[in-house]
Amino acid sequence: MSCSGSLSTCTLDSGDLYYSFESDLPYSAWFFFKTMNVSGAEAVIAAASPFIGQGESACLVKPYVDVMTDSEIHLAMTSGFSTIAGSVLLAYISLGVPAQNLITSSVMSIPASIAISKMRFPETEEPITRGRVVVDRGEHGPDAPANALHAFSQGAVFGLIVAGLILANLLTILSLIAAINGLLTWVGQGFSINHLTLELIIGYIFYPVTFFLGVPRGEILRVARLLATKLVANEFSAYLSLQAIMQSDNPLSYRAWVITQYALCGFANLGSVGIQIGVLGAMAPSKASTISRVAFSAMICGFIT
């Protein structure tokens, strides 16, 4: 994720006069609203995710997060997992990934994430934003800021709360992963299996997935391990590993390289589960149980897209 936490949040809150993206966003959201038959809040979050990232896109409909249906929350999380944010684009470009591939992958993931999320978690309730596209960060409510300075202060306080929740959830999940890897390594030593970890196991599980992606047969296992690195660690670590492979004496073929670039693009990893739970949980405390319940399902859906 973009771990821009406090800064991104307070920037969104203080930008009601200066944030020009808001004026263009409804047009993009309207397209998905009309073509994908989703609620206005879902359309806004999905359309904004490739630009401002997971979690932060929900700030654009902040007053409605607390009254979202379970299906809407699932879609909001899925769209965040399936894309990257503009704030990390340059970092991936510096690793040798062409910008057009990253942007294309993120944009294509918007309708894909909507479709997969709705197949996995169909809407059974009536969303409050059904029939209208709405962009509302809460600047016109009873707690509306008096001026830009007040808005920045409110955003900073909220961002601090979000950052604390992100840190707590992220440390919990990363600690759990480390504990599982330690247990697997200990068990593996008893069976003479060196370095048995989640990444290794998931890499073999992803072998058929990588095959269906169209990767040449001789390179399937290497690409599958990169996908496992993305899921267990994060996409940045996976792109670093991809860069190392491409600079080695045995690089991937051009076809496998391009497919891998697209497959690794997105925030779908175990660490991001903690981030999204923290961000959305701060905006909608009453939905904390729902957010935690659908988080892993949304991550898998986001990974698929």
Give the residues covered by each predicted segment.
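Juxtamembrane loop-helix boundary motifs flanking transmembrane segments in multi-pass membrane proteins
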Residues: 16, 20-27, 39-40, 52, ...
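Membrane-lumen (extracellular) interface motif
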Residues: 88-108, 187-194
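Alpha-helical membrane segments and immediately flanking helix-loop junctions
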Residues: 35-94, 109, 224-305
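Hydrophobic transmembrane alpha-helical segments of multi-pass transport and channel proteins
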Residues: 103, 107-119, 159, 163, ...
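Hydrophobic alpha-helical hairpins/lids featuring a short glycine-rich hinge
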Residues: 1-38
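Long, contiguous bundles of hydrophobic transmembrane helices that form the permeation core
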Residues: 107-110, 114-160
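Transmembrane helical segments that form the transport core of multi-pass membrane transport proteins
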Residues: 157-248
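Hydrophobic core segments of alpha-helical transmembrane domains in multi-pass membrane transport
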Residues: 5-14, 82-91, 106-120, 169-182, ...
